[in-house]
Design a protein with these regions (language model features):
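Local cysteine-cluster metal-coordination motifs and their immediate loop/turn environment
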Residues: 239, 247-267
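Conserved C-terminal portion of the radical SAM core fold
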Residues: 97-164, 183-200
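Active-site beta-loop-alpha junctions enriched in small/polar residues
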Residues: 8-10, 57, 79-83, 119-121, ...
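Conserved Radical SAM active-site core
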Residues: 1-88, 95-111, 268-312
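Surface-exposed cleft-lining segments at the edges of enzyme active sites
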Residues: 84-92, 120-130, 165-173
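A C-terminal junction/extension of Radical SAM enzymes
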Residues: 176-242
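Short catalytic/ligand-binding loop motif for oxyanion handling, primarily in non-cytosolic enzymes
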Residues: 85-86, 122-126, 158-161, 204-208, ...
Length: 312
């Protein structure tokens, strides 16, 4: 089983102590986002957790506790863009905090365990194609020694993102603009020996040498863990998504990064209310189990292929 921690919220930044408590207890409770009264109990013991993918914009709260992950195979999806505080309202200084934390994380765990994400890309009067290219190059120069690749994507429109981003006056991206950005980013990435891929994009950028990313990546885990995994593509993701199956242990409306483009937060009020219900000792990310809730233990097993090959 692979754990996603989490597409729905920034666990390393805001819930790292809770997460380490869950590892000590070796289980976590997760509400079904489609039915909040259904709660899954997930085994977090190393014997069944084959890997953990952390999604974050700021891993600083975890940096002094990485040794507590030594029994697990893991890597980070680390989003670092060129947007300012009017877009990513809750992040600390990128030059003083975020970029140094990226570099430190890579030094401590290795560059193959830190994937840079520059996404989502959108355009307006300030954030033009030239702006993105200029600052993508700046970031690439600082991050290339500390990662193997960069994954990019273009902004997807959801009801809550359209509402939240209205003050930014976004210009819809045309296919030609996407291709222009891809072509220019590829040249920059090549300059710094970075592999470039895209996350769940419907357009084919193969002629630029850019393929679909596998953000929850079977091959990366096999390299890190030196094992073979019998895991299938995640059927719950879009067709263009290359991710393999995983269990997400986060919750929507809990991330305090304040990114206006975020699909996982519906309102700042909901985020604040849910964060106020966070308990470090609770098996749930926020709130508690109520009488009307039904808790069911998920049947999970290790997906590592234990059979010896002919050549082993």
């Amino acid at each position: 089983m692979i754990i996603s921690a989490s597409r729905r919220t920034d666990i390393p930044s805001y819930y790292s102590e809770w997460f380490f408590n869950r590892l000590k207890e070796q289980y976590v409770l997760v509400r079904n986002p489609m039915n909040m009264h259904q709660i899954g109990k997930i085994d977090l013991s190393p014997k069944v957790v084959d890997g953990i993918v952390f999604w974050t914009k700021n891993p600083v709260p975890m940096l002094n506790r990485l040794e507590e992950l030594e029994k697990y195979n893991y890597y980070f999806q680390f989003t670092l863009t060129a947007y300012g505080p009017e877009v990513e309202t809750g992040l600390p200084s990128k030059n003083k905090v975020i970029i140094p934390s990226f570099q430190r994380l890579s030094k401590e765990i290795g560059k193959k365990k830190v994937v840079w994400r520059y996404d989502p890309i959108f355009l307006n009067e300030k954030y033009t194609i030239d702006y993105h290219c200029r600052y993508f190059a700046v970031l690439a120069s600082k991050l290339a020694p500390y990662t193997e690749k960069c994954t990019i994507s273009f902004l997807d429109y959801y009801r809550n993102t359209e509402r939240n981003m209205k003050p930014l006056h976004i210009h819809p991206l045309t296919v030609e603009q996407q291709k222009e950005i891809i072509e220019k980013f590829v040249r920059i990435a090549q300059r710094y020996n970075l592999h470039l891929d895209t996350c769940a994009e419907s357009c084919d950028f193969g002629k630029f040498g850019v393929s679909h990313a596998c953000c929850i990546d079977k091959e990366r885990f096999e390299r890190i863990g030196k094992y073979k995994l019998n895991v299938e593509k995640d059927k719950n993701q879009r067709e263009e998504c290359g991710c393999v199956a995983s269990i997400d242990i986060g919750a929507y409306n809990t991330c305090r990064n304040g990114c206006l483009y975020c699909y996982a937060n519906y309102s700042g009020m909901s985020v604040n209310n849910n964060f106020g219900k966070h308990n470090l000792e609770s098996p749930l990310l926020f709130g508690k189990v109520n009488e009307e809730d039904k808790v069911k233990e998920r049947n999970v097993t290790s997906l590592i292929d234990r059979q010896m090959t002919l050549f082993e």
